[in-house]
């Protein structure tokens, strides 16, 4: 597509298939423009983005930094309005997401596909890689493990209760509760609150904060990661990702609806 950006000093700029042109020629220099309602500043070399592009919240604080090499996006950092790092990824490093207090909440290895979700205290909560997965409580005690689709015996005992449901018990402590059909279950924090629920009949799973607010929700294909107040931080639907600030503003990293171009040098 071609998008008219602006006429600055008599020069007409347009972005076509990722290349910036000025009066039909590949443009070079530092430019400032709007992407949607957000201001962006960065450098183009022979029409291609090159170097670090900064995108700003409406209050002027940095929303994200995108690193480009010859038009290729090689790394990205997202920020909260207070300057705290929200997330980062690159071609060689995993995607990492953080809460506003700096604690890591999730990492995704973009090469292997391994996904790790963390407890509030920074201890791994769940790690998934292919058909293998492991779940820990907040004390780093393993509650569940499956390797290549096969459950691993952790020394726990499955006890059936009078109503037909089950409790998974280890060292006189209940690790999980499972319904009579074995399809719906809940793993527990060390203090007894629901930690993770699953429903094998529809692939729905949820991870909960201790107060019951949903941290993570997935149907096996799509998933949502939330802030502590239940508002979305990160959504993945198929191959589409979305990030949100803690006040609900969507953070968009691509250059859409470009307007108000200004050449700075």
Region locations from a protein language model:
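Bacterial N-terminal signal peptides
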Residues: 1-4
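Glycine/tyrosine- and acidic-biased, solvent-exposed loop/turn segments at the edges of beta-strands
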Residues: 6-265
């Amino acid at each position: 597509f071609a998008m008219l950006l602006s006429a600055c000093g008599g020069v007409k700029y347009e972005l076509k298939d990722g290349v910036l042109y000025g009066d039909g020629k590949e443009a070079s220099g530092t430019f400032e423009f709007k992407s949607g309602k957000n201001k962006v500043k960065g450098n183009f070399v022979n029409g291609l983005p090159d170097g670090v592009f900064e995108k700003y919240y409406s209050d002027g604080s940095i929303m994200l930094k995108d690193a480009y090499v010859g038009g290729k996006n090689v790394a990205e950092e997202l920020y909260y309005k207070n300057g705290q790092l929200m997330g980062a990824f690159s071609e060689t490093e995993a995607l990492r997401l953080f809460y506003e207090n700096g604690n890591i909440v999730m990492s995704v290895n973009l090469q292997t596909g391994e996904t790790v979700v963390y407890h509030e205290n920074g201890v791994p909560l769940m790690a998934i890689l292919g058909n293998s997965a492991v779940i820990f409580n907040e004390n780093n005690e393993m509650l569940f493990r499956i390797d290549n689709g096969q459950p691993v015996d952790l020394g726990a005992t499955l006890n059936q209760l009078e109503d037909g449901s089950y409790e998974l018990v280890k060292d006189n402590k209940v690790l999980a509760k499972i319904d009579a059909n074995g399809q719906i279950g809940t793993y527990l924090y060390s203090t007894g609150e629901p930690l993770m629920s699953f429903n094998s009949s529809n692939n729905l799973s949820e991870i909960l904060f201790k107060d019951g607010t949903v941290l993570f929700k997935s149907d096996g294909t799509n998933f949502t990661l939330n802030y502590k107040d239940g508002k979305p931080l990160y959504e993945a639907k198929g191959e589409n990702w979305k990030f949100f600030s803690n006040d609900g503003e969507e953070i968009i990293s691509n250059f859409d609806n470009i307007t108000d171009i200004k050449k700075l040098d």
